[in-house]
Amino acid sequence: MIRCLTLVMLTLLPAAIWGADNRPSWPQFRGPAGSGIADGQNPPIEMGPEKNVKWKAPVPSGLSSPIITGELVVITAFENEKLYTIAYDRTSGKEVWRADAQAKQLEVYNQTHGSPTASTPATEGERIVSYFGSCGLVCYDLAGKPLWRFEMPPAATAGGFGSGVSPIIADGTVVLVRDTPQESKIVALDAVTGTLKWEAKRQSPSSYSTPVAWDTPTGKQVVVAGHARMIGYDLKTGAERWSLAGTPSGCCSSPVIAGGTLYFAGWSPGGPDDKETQMPTFDKMLKDMDKDKDGAISREEGGKDFEGMFASMDGNKDNKITSDEWDVILKFMAEGINNAFALKSGGTGDITDSHMLWKKSKGMPYLASAIVYGGQYVMVKDGGIVTAYDEKTGDELYQKRAAATGAYYASPVACAGHIYFTSHDDGTVTVIKAGTTEPEVAAKNPPLGEKVAATPAIAGDTIYIRTAGHLYAFAK
């Protein structure tokens, strides 16, 4: 009862109390401007279940990353069939408020790898905007009071995987990309009122890449990496300024801006230059898997090879993969290109060849977005393989197994001369020194013992990490 009364009193406090300070913030997916960098902050490099734990709070399920504003750490979460935005006290880890998005229907999502709360909220310090593929955008003040909502029907994502893209806020504008096979578009809303400023139709049937705002000589743009193509839109009007061919078929990683240059690295299975994933012909699949000889592959026949992916491949949802469905998948995959590149600003129209500063084809991540730090463009791929390219020239500096093995969903973050990599399978945080010509591990920490899909947040002397069941705050 005392705890309940405390939560009620905290919720009734004015929003100014939770936001009225100048403490460092982490306002969106990947932090300030989506950079992954916390300049001037000083969190520990050593951490673990019993090491430098400032606090640890249980959290409901969800894949969104924490953001930080004022006294609050904010996530989205899924519990008892409801979609929540939840705020925790930054100092103590106590829950301050939670707000139900009141979705009428949940989007279809992959029960193994997805979540109806996979999108990270965004803030500009006065309000918090959350996106749910089930119902659209919802905006709250810092006390959890609803300010506006932009209703959208449940997203029908490719293969029913579920939503993953996060909103951003730039110059008072909320920007959201929603790419689905039925309808793809980018929308821009007034952050204060939720009024639609503009929307633009897109041709990308699937994308999970969060956009980035780019200051260019001709004005601010919002850049979106989608299926096989990247596009730059005018932030004020939504007009398409430029585009380029050469992104993966299924974009999950996001671009980043550094020194006026745009960087991107992405990988998706089955690209034309993909040496890692050789997609079999349908005849080969029938020979190896079609036990009942019906000319199709059932879920049971696919077994572990298709575990977690079957729903995405079964277009008509008849629990079988046919030759026609497999052809659609192969065509989709073949249209993309897996690479890493740097792009200069100022272009219009098709800039595929004209504005590319450098391009590489090694080390690209599938889910974890790369980071520009210490004069290098650094990325981590599954297996703990860390690749560093010279920021200016694109020269490869190293590619070595420097982080813990396993998959990587969380994007690297950096501050105080260090880069932090967090593994998905057991939450091992590996910290390397930035700007070196060989990977120098500064700390390889004990596993947190839970899966980690969320990108850490850094503010002040603390790094915040969301695991499958907890939110940690680590400080010296």
Where are these regions (language model features)?
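Positively charged n-region of N-terminal signal peptides that target proteins for export
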Residues: 1-5, 476
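Bacterial N-terminal signal peptides
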Residues: 4-16
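Noncatalytic, solvent-exposed loop/strand surfaces
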Residues: 18-476
